[in-house]
């Protein structure tokens, strides 16, 4: 599974500005989903890869980013 890492409080994606390989996104994806996860910046959001099937990613049901 893969997807955008999401802030549970506001429903927003984690933003990033350096597209492609991105240390911030990799660090955040691994902190949330474990050291086996990968992460990079895609369309100005942190995209996480190699996630377990039940991993919670953006969008959150009933929670819009505002």
Curated annotation (Swiss-Prot):
Single GO cellular component term: extracellular region
Summary of the tissues where the protein is detected: Expressed by the venom gland.
Family: Belongs to the long (4 C-C) scorpion toxin superfamily. Sodium channel inhibitor family. Beta subfamily.
Entry-linked SUPFAM superfamilies: Scorpion toxin-like
Extra facts: Negative results: a mixture of Cbo2 and Cbo3 does not modify the currents of the human voltage-gated sodium channels Nav1.1/SCN1A, Nav1.2/SCN2A, Nav1.3/SCN3A, Nav1.5/SCN5A and Nav1.7/SCN9A.
Disulfide bonds: 12-65, 16-41, 25-46, 29-48
InterPro entries membership: LCN-type_CS_alpha_beta_dom, Scorpion_toxin-like, Scorpion_toxin-like_sf, Scorpion_toxinL
Keywords: Amidation, Disulfide bond, Ion channel impairing toxin, Neurotoxin, Secreted, Toxin, Voltage-gated sodium channel impairing toxin
Single biological process term from Gene Ontology: defense response
Primary role: Beta toxins bind voltage-independently at site-4 of sodium channels and shift the voltage of activation toward more negative potentials thereby affecting sodium channel activation and promoting spontaneous and repetitive firing. A mixture of Cbo2 and Cbo3 is weakly active on the human voltage-gated sodium channels Nav1.4/SCN4A and Nav1.6/SCN8A when tested at 200 nM. In vivo, is toxic to mice when intraperitoneally injected.
Annotated positions of the Asparagine amide modification: 66
Residue ranges of domain LCN-type CS-alpha/beta in the record: 1-66
One MF annotation (Gene Ontology) recorded for this entry: sodium channel inhibitor activity
Keyword Disulfide bond applies: yes
Source organism of the structure: Centruroides bonito
Domain of life: Eukaryota
Name of the featured protein: Beta-toxin Cbo2
Domain notes: Has the structural arrangement of an alpha-helix connected to antiparallel beta-sheets by disulfide bonds (CS-alpha/beta).
Subcellular location: Secreted
Keyword Secreted on entry: yes
